[in-house]
């Protein structure tokens, strides 16, 4: 697969397919990559419908350059914008999974004219506040003293630096209202134990627009990767294209 080389000479792995517009860009979640079920399902959908499609890996994820702990939300936002500016053609539908949903909103605010619509899959904007609040006091003290901690969650362990927390707070989008006059669809599983089902409502309270939908899936979890979930995602893209 090809790599985009950024201004720091760091490689960002991506895959793109040609087709008609609007294009689709899939943005993976924290500590994930571009090879999951949702990304591959979207690629199949794009091929079937002859649509442009891109999936990529933020630095510190998958086979892109760098160590996870060396990057922040600002860095990953820059990766997405680099893909939009240098690889994508024309208008795009951004599909953001979990953390990718946060990056999706940040990119939409930075490049509004390039975005045809947004689809959040268990979107988790501003999640760092909640993450830090839930950290045990011992871990908070360790981070203050050493500037880095080892964190384990849902079977994964990774290093987190203090700058990750500080930078995340600088990138909050729900601290004030903003207008979005294009389609926004938030898809949320009611059995999600990572991003709670009340998050979509918090999001739409801060985003002002007339084309905003929330789709609650009763039997779906955070992964949103079963056949029913994938069909809902594909149908949502189709509805934005028809719109």
Model-derived regions: residue spans:
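Catalytic histidine-centered segment of alpha/beta-hydrolase-like enzymes
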Residues: 220-232
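Conserved alpha/beta-hydrolase
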Residues: 39, 43-65
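Short beta-strand/loop motif that positions the catalytic acidic residue
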Residues: 180, 186-188, 192
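Acidic catalytic loop of the alpha/beta-hydrolase fold
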Residues: 191-195, 222-223
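Hydrolase active-site cap/lid region
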Residues: 113-160
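Short alpha-helix in the alpha/beta-hydrolase fold that links the catalytic acid
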Residues: 39, 182, 196-205
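N-terminal cap/lid segment of alpha/beta-hydrolase-fold proteins
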Residues: 1-18
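Catalytic nucleophile-loop/oxyanion-hole region of alpha/beta-hydrolase
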Residues: 62-87
């Amino acid at each position: 697969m090809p790599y985009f080389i950024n201004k720091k000479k760091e490689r960002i792995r991506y895959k793109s397919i040609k087709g008609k517009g609007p294009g689709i860009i899939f943005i993976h979640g924290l500590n994930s990559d571009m090879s999951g079920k949702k990304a591959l399902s979207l690629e199949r959908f794009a091929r079937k419908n002859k649509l442009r499609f891109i999936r990529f890996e933020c630095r510190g994820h998958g086979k892109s350059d760098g160590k996870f702990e060396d990057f922040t939300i600002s860095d990953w936002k820059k990766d997405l914008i680099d893909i939009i500016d240098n690889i994508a053609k024309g208008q795009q539908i951004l599909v953001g999974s979990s953390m990718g949903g946060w990056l999706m909103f940040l990119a939409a605010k930075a490049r509004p004219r390039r975005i045809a619509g947004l689809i959040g899959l268990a979107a988790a904007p501003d999640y760092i506040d909640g993450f830090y609040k839930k950290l045990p006091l011992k871990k908070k003290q360790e981070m203050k003293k050493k500037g880095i901690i080892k964190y384990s969650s849902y079977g994964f362990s990774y290093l987190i630096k203090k700058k990750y927390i500080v930078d995340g707070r600088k990138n909050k989008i729900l601290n004030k209202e903003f207008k979005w006059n294009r389609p926004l669809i938030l898809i949320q599983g009611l059995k999600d134990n990572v991003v709670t089902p009340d998050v979509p409502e918090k999001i739409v309270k801060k985003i002002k627009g007339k084309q905003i939908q929330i789709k609650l899936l009763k039997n779906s979890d955070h992964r949103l990767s079963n056949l029913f979930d994938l069909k809902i995602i594909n149908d949502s893209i189709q509805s934005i294209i028809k719109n």
